[in-house]
């Protein structure tokens, strides 16, 4: 099969207006860059192509600088614009996972609207991905491995080389006299993917010549079965998930465990989260969904937190504890912590008007020091005709989830609470 003509056919079906090539400088991505450069030269026979490349400098290898320089030379040769992005790798969950997370987050910054990320994954990579999913005990979703087009980390991804083997890419590279770099870490069999690539899969291919194609068929069967399950559950799923980061639990407890886990996996997939293990899903169901009514349960899943409130699950990021945070308001704008944005103040003859996000509150002027705090316990008078009430009850009446209550800016005049911006103000007792 001819690489160039095959990719040309694939591009005719692509809806993107631009393509951002993930370029490591290795064999696979160098072949990919060369193919797209050729397609750009054939533009009179194609819709105009907008092609850029991006190289992620992880800083993990002593050769990282030379790899970046090599990629720049390649792109100069092919007249394709290149972005070089340096990243810091968080090794908490392992170098592989940290590098992958850093890489995709960096790429996401540069990916433009109507542009697809193009990666050089090929058939041999597909087999490795399938085996890694098998090792983790993955279900249909994980065993579906990689698709030619998908969404990952919220980005559209195009993998035009999935139907080709590594030897086919090597043949093309030699014919085109391409130069590429070699990552020395690829020989380190302490990494699972390298162990499979260097030790296990060569023996399987030696025994069964078409082993990779058979794995690809199995992965496709898994994908089709998962799609069928999603189709059969789509109407029920829509009833539970009308807002992307919220999952309603009404009737959920009446379903079988298999149906519950399938619906939860659909919700997590909709939010582009990696699939949890069966043990994690069972823990989520038992410890969060079936927790006591008055509980405030939560479940950490990678860099997200699943919380329950009023018979719904909510997906949020992890939040910092702000209850001990006190900020003095000395200017007309205050930068709030933990990505809460800015609080601004405008004044007229008698009043101060506080703005935060889409909310505002008007308070009388004061000579007392003004501060912003988060979290409060006690009774307040939030309505002129009602007695003082416990603030917890007020939050409940306003249907504010517990984790949001300590993230709403509270305005204090001296040590007296005056307002929760956008939710209530405190009235004096006469």
From Swiss-Prot:
Keywords: ATP-binding, Cytoplasm, Ligase, Nucleotide-binding, tRNA processing
Residues that hold ATP according to the record: 24-29
Catalytic activity: cytidine(34) in tRNA(Ile2) + L-lysine + ATP = lysidine(34) in tRNA(Ile2) + AMP + diphosphate + H(+)
GO molecular function, one term: tRNA(Ile)-lysidine synthase activity
Subcellular location: Cytoplasm
Described function: Ligates lysine onto the cytidine present at position 34 of the AUA codon-specific tRNA(Ile) that contains the anticodon CAU, in an ATP-dependent manner. Cytidine is converted to lysidine, thus changing the amino acid specificity of the tRNA from methionine to isoleucine.
Name of the featured protein: tRNA(Ile)-lysidine synthase
Lineage: Bacteria, Pseudomonadati, Pseudomonadota, Gammaproteobacteria, Pasteurellales
């Amino acid at each position: 099969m001819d690489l160039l003509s095959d990719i040309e056919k694939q591009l005719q079906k692509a809806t993107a207006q631009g393509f951002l090539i993930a370029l490591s400088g290795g064999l696979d991505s160098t072949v990919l860059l060369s193919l797209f450069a050729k397609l750009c030269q054939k533009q009179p026979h194609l819709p105009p192509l907008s092609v850029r490349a991006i190289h992620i400098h992880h800083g993990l290898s002593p050769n990282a600088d030379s790899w970046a320089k090599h990629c720049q030379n390649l792109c100069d040769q092919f007249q394709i614009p290149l972005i070089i992005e340096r990243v810091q790798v968080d090794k908490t969950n392992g170098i592989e996972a940290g590098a992958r997370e850093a890489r995709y987050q960096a790429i996401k910054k540069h990916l433009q609207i109507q542009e697809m990320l193009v990666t050089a994954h090929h058939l041999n990579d597909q087999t490795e991905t399938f085996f890694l999913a098998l090792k983790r005990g993955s279900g249909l979703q994980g065993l579906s491995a990689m698709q030619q087009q998908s969404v990952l980390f919220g980005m559209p991804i195009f993998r035009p080389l999935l139907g080709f083997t590594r030897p086919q890419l090597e043949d093309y590279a030699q014919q085109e006299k391409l130069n590429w770099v070699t990552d020395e870490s690829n020989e380190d069999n302490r990494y699972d993917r390298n162990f499979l690539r260097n030790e296990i899969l060569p023996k399987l291919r030696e025994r069964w010549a078409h082993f990779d194609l058979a794995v690809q068929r199995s992965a496709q069967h898994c994908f089709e079965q998962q799609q069928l399950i999603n189709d059969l559950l789509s109407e029920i799923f829509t009833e539970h998930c009308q807002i992307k980061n919220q999952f309603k639990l009404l009737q959920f407890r009446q379903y079988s465990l298999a149906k519950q886990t399938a619906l939860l996996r659909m919700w997590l997939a909709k939010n582009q989260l990696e699939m949890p293990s069966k043990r994690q899903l069972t823990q989520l169901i038992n410890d969060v969904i079936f927790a006591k009514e008055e509980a405030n349960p939560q479940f950490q899943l990678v860099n997200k937190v699943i919380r329950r409130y009023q018979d719904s699950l909510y997906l949020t990021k992890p939040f910092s504890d702000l209850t001990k945070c006190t900020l003095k308001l000395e200017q007309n704008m205050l930068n709030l912590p933990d990505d809460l944005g800015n609080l601004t103040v405008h004044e007229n003859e008698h009043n101060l008007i506080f703005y935060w996000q889409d909310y505002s509150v008007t308070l009388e002027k004061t000579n007392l020091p003004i501060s912003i705090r988060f979290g409060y316990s006690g009774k307040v008078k939030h309505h002129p005709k009602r007695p003082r009430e416990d603030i917890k009850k007020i939050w409940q009446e306003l249907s504010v989830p517990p984790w949001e209550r300590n993230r709403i800016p509270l305005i204090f005049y001296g040590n007296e609470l005056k307002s929760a911006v956008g939710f209530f103000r405190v009235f004096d007792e006469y």
